[in-house]
Design a protein with these regions (language model features):
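C-type cytochrome heme-c attachment and multiheme electron-transfer modules
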Residues: 1-137
Length: 137
């Protein structure tokens, strides 16, 4: 299943995100404002996000077929953004980077194609829509 994929931020763009948002600092800091969540404790770099969605893995037809509960990223169409700022295309074209799932697959840090539901999500989290964009449940 998808959650058995290892978290391997293989691209610079996810490494850039994780340089601040590693689960220990800047948990809810974005959009030019300081977050309110403060964490204390020992160093947990590399483990803090292990219970979150994996990143840095190849999401392709072979994975979708083997998993059985994922949409084929080359045929499933999704719409990211909201209002006048939307883009429609396959999962591969709108959410993946060189065929890999990265932080920016779901989060739009430049706020160009956000769904307006918080967390800078490209697809609304209402009714688990962001999850159902890829997961066939």
């Amino acid at each position: 299943r998808t959650f058995s994929q290892k978290m391997v931020p293989s691209r610079r763009l996810s490494k850039l995100c994780l340089s601040c948002h590693d689960g220990t600092v800047a948990v809810d800091s974005f959009g030019g404002r300081t977050g309110t969540t403060l964490l204390t404790g020992g160093d947990s770099v590399g483990t803090a996000l292990n219970n979150d969605h994996p990143i840095g893995f190849t999401y392709n037809t072979a994975l979708a077929t083997a998993d059985g509960s994922l949409h084929d990223p080359n045929t499933k169409t999704v719409t990211i953004g909201s209002g006048a700022q939307t883009k429609t295309g396959t999962i591969a074209a709108t959410m993946l980077y060189s065929g890999k799932l990265e932080c920016s697959s779901c989060h739009d840090v430049h706020n160009t194609f956000t769904a307006g539901s918080g967390g800078l999500l490209k697809v609304s989290d209402t009714g688990s829509a962001i999850c159902l964009a890829c997961h066939n449940k």
